Every structure is written in C-alpha cells, then in structure tokens.
C-alpha cells in the first residue's frame, strides 16, 4: 500500500490527511507525520498503518490533556477520567500519562498541596472535607496525610470561627444555647472536629450577653404572641412557650420573662 498524496486539513493546519492508493485512509498530527517520515510514494504495511494510527491517538490525546491542564492543575486521576470521557483507549491513556509525568505536567503531591492551600484560603472548609475531596481526586493516603498536616490548629480555629460568625448572623433569632448547637452541627458538616466546632461556637457567641438574649426573647415573644392571638389564652400561651423552647430558650427563662414583664395571655375585658 502506497501513499499517493498528503493534504493539510482546512480546519486544522497541524493535521494531515493521508491517501493510500488514491483513497483517503487516515489523518495524523504534524509531529506523527515527521516522526514516521510520511511522504508521497512511501509504502506502508497494514501493521505499520495501525502503529501510526495508535501513535496519532496518543498525540491527539496528549494535546487534549495539555489543553485540559491549561485551565488549572489536575490530579492524575482527573486527567485519566477526562481522557476516558474523550473515548481514548486504555493503552493510549497510560502512555499519555507517562508522557505528561515526564514533562512535569503531573505531580500529585504538588497538586494536593496547592489544592489544600486554596481550599483553606478561599472556602474555609474543615480538614475532613478537604481530605474527602482529595480522596475523590485519587490522591494516596500518604499524600493526603502529608498535606493535611499543613492545616494548623490555629488556621482551623480561625476559619471555623469565621464560619461560625456567618452561621450566627443567619440564625440571630435563636437563643444562645440553640445558636451554639446550630453552629457546632454546621461546622461538623463542613469538616471540622466536634471539639474544634465547640471552641469556635463559644468564640463566635462570646460577645452575646444576657441583654442581647433578653432582647431576642422579647422580639420572639411579641412575634409569637401576634401569631397565636387567634387562639384561646391558655392555648396561645402553650403554643408561644413551645415555639420559644424550640428556638432554644429554657422554660424557666421564658416564664421569668413573662412574669417580670407582666405579660399576660388573658383576654382584655
């Protein structure tokens, strides 16, 4: 089988169409064309054509992988998954990954370090969440342990406290005790340990004093009483107290406030 002509593709000047015996047979990257010294008149066997096609698949996949990496650093698993989605064959993926590693495009330790630092600075995630994400990205346990150790206790507490303050601002209608529990629960879900979450919750709510809680309680009582005024006095009182307890106020605190402020649920005559 002889190459009878070679033409440059119109849409991609770095790819060439190869014609065998006057008929289009396959196309190759410019680098593959030069490597195999493809030219008009060259005779190729079927085995050699298959070899060239495989080499071109690797070259094409390598170009795609480099473009994929141009947007941000990736882990080896992310690149492998991407190439699979591009329908690359297994042999090509392995060879592409080896070439990328030789070119220093893949370094899972550097990726993990950069990813962890970025998450710490920009997302305020806890260490457990970052660990889980690194596992999903295919990092080894050894690498994960190494990079997570760089997330100091001081940095964790600082980030957890910042998160706690955000949570507190979104839930400023609850009693201090309930608010602290909400903060602890949310911080644990964000990847912090329960011990650190408790410290951060205490730190974030440290400036809330008795006067602040009394003001919150007053507003909640007024709001709840308006909502329940259509009920009989005894039922309205019960519903109001229940609602306030659900927001974290203790029964004794509610009763004391009602008594001290002479708040009655009896109908006015």
UniProtKB/Swiss-Prot annotation:
It is found in: Cytoplasm. The lineage of its organism: Bacteria, Bacillati, Bacillota, Bacilli, Bacillales. One of its GO terms (biological process) is regulation of DNA repair. It holds the Pfam family RecX_HTH1. One of its GO terms (cellular component) is cytoplasm. This is Regulatory protein RecX. Gene3D superfamilies: Winged helix-like DNA-binding domain superfamily/Winged helix DNA-binding domain. Its main location: cytoplasm. PANTHER family: REGULATORY PROTEIN RECX FAMILY PROTEIN. Keywords: Cytoplasm.
